[in-house]
Amino acid sequence: MTKQGIATLGVLLLVGASHAAERVLNPYRDVDWGTVTYVHSFSHQHATHGRLQTLRDMGYEHLPISNYYPSKPLYPLPEDFRKANPDVLGAPNAEQHSTTDSPIHFNAIGSYYTTGYGETPRVRRDRSPIEHVFRGLHVFDPAREPWRGIYRLDLRFDAAANSGEASVRLTVEGARQASYKDFSEPADGGIVRDRVLTLASARSMTFKATAPEIRVQIVFDPAVTRITQFRLMQGTYRPWRDTFRAALDGSARDAEGRPIEGLMFPEGGGITINHPGESVTRLAEYLDFDPRVLGIEVWNQHEMFGGQTLEKAATMPFYTLWDEVLRTGRRCFGFFVKDHCIFGRGRNVLLMPPGGDTATRERQALQAYRNGRFFGLLGAMTVGADGKPTMPYDQSNFRFTRLALRREADKPVSLDVSVDGADTQRRPNTQIRFITDQGVACVVDGNSGSFILPRSADGRVACRYVRVEAFAYPNTHSGGQTLTPAAFTALNVFQIARLHDVRGDSGVVYMDGKDGTPLGI
C-alpha cells in the first residue's frame, strides 16, 4: 500500500487585536488539552443515504450532511444507520444558493433551513417527444412568499455524431417564464409553446408556476440531437440577507409542524461561506451581518485552495483571501471540506470534552463550530498499487495537542504549540509554521514550538492575528529523492498538498501529469 499524499496539514486561528487593551480572541482558551476528544466532522459534504457508512468508516463521528435540490437537512440521521452506529452524531445542515442579489453558496450548519426542489425525470432521452409532469409545486403568489413559486428548468443537448446543427422545440404548461431576481415576465408574457432552442440558446430558464403541476414537452430529432440534461430545480430566490435571517432566526414550520428555519441550538452552529469567489469587501459584508456568520472555506477538494485549473489553483485564491480578511481585523474561521468528493481530502476536527450522551455531544459539536474550537486537516490519501484510493482513505490522527496563549502580567506573550499522532514510520518529520499579517513569521522543525508575539516600539502587540500550520512529511519522496527540511520549508501549502509518489484518481489530481510527482524536489 502506498500513499498518494505525503503531508498532513492542520490550520487553526488565533486573532489578536493590537489596540491599547490588547484584546485577544483565542478560540482555544477553554480547551482542556489533557482530556479533549478529537471529533472528525465536515461543514459541507454532499452524500446519499448509501454513502453514510462509508463516511463513518473513514473516521467521521459528526455527520451534518448538506445536500441541495432540495436543500433539506438529513437529520435525524436514518434510523438503520444510527442503530448500526450508536455513537454517531448528526446535525441539520444544507447548502443554500441562488439568492437574488449575490452569487453566494453557503451552508447553515445546525440550521433547519429548508428550501428548494429538485427532480430529474427518468425518461428515454433517445426518443421524441419527451414528456413529463412535475407535481407538488408551489403556485406563485406575489403577496405571500413568492420565491416558493419560482423554478429553474435545465435543458441541455448537443449534436449527435456528424449530425450537424442540433435543436429542440420546447413547450411548458402550468408556468410562465420569469426573472428569478425580480419575478418579472418578459414582454411576450412568458408563454413557452413550441419554442425553438438551438445550441446558442440559454441552457436554463426560470419559470413562475401558475399551477401545482408543470407539464414539459421536448420535441427533437434523435438522429440530429442528443438530450444530455433535463431537470426542474429550485433555489432560495431571496436576497441573501433574508436567507441568512431565515437560516439563523427563522421560525417557519412545514405542514407536519417540523421546523424548516432557524438553528437547532441558539448557542451553536452558524453560516459558512462556500468556495468563496468574491472580494474582501463583499466577504466583510457577509461577516459583519451577524457574528453567527463564521467564516469561509479555505480548502475545497474540487479546487484545492481555490481554482479549477492548475494555473489558477497555484495562486491559492481561497487561502490568500482568508489572510486578506484576517488583515482587516475580522474574525474569520477557515473550513476544510470535500464538498461532493467522498474520496477526497479536507476535514474539520472538533475539539470537544469527553463523555456525554448523544444529545449533549450534538450540542457540543455545534458549539465547537460556533466558537472556533476546531482545526482544519488534510490527511494523506491512502491508495493501492493501482493508484486508486482505498481504506482508510484520508483519515489521519495527526493533531494539535496544545495551542496555548501564554501570558505574563496579564499580557499575551507567546503562542505555545505541540502536535502528535503522525505515522512516524511513513512521515517522521514535523514542521510548524506561524503566520501573521506579515506572512510566515516563524518556522520550527519539530513537534513543538513557541512563537513570541512581536511588539512595536510602544510595547503593543505588533500583529493582528496568528495562524498555525503543522506538517508531517517523509525523509524521501518521488522514488527516493531526499526531502530535507530546507527543501520542505521552501514549499507553500499548495505545493505541499500536491506532493505524491503515486497518481490517484479522485479530486484535483486531474491537474497532474500522467506519472509521478508534480514537483522536482
Where are these regions (language model features)?
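Bacterial N-terminal signal peptides that target proteins for export
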Residues: 1-7
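Post-cleavage N-terminal segment of exported redox proteins
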Residues: 4, 17-20
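Alpha-helical structural motif
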Residues: 6, 318, 361-365
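Bacterial N-terminal signal peptides
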Residues: 7-16
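C-terminal functional module detector
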Residues: 21-35, 48, 128-231, 328-333, ...
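A metal-dependent hydrolase metal-coordination microenvironment
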Residues: 22-138, 143, 148, 221-283, ...
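Non-transmembrane alpha-helical segments in soluble domains
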Residues: 244-248, 323-326, 366, 370
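Glycoside hydrolase catalytic-domain groove-lining segments
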Residues: 312-335
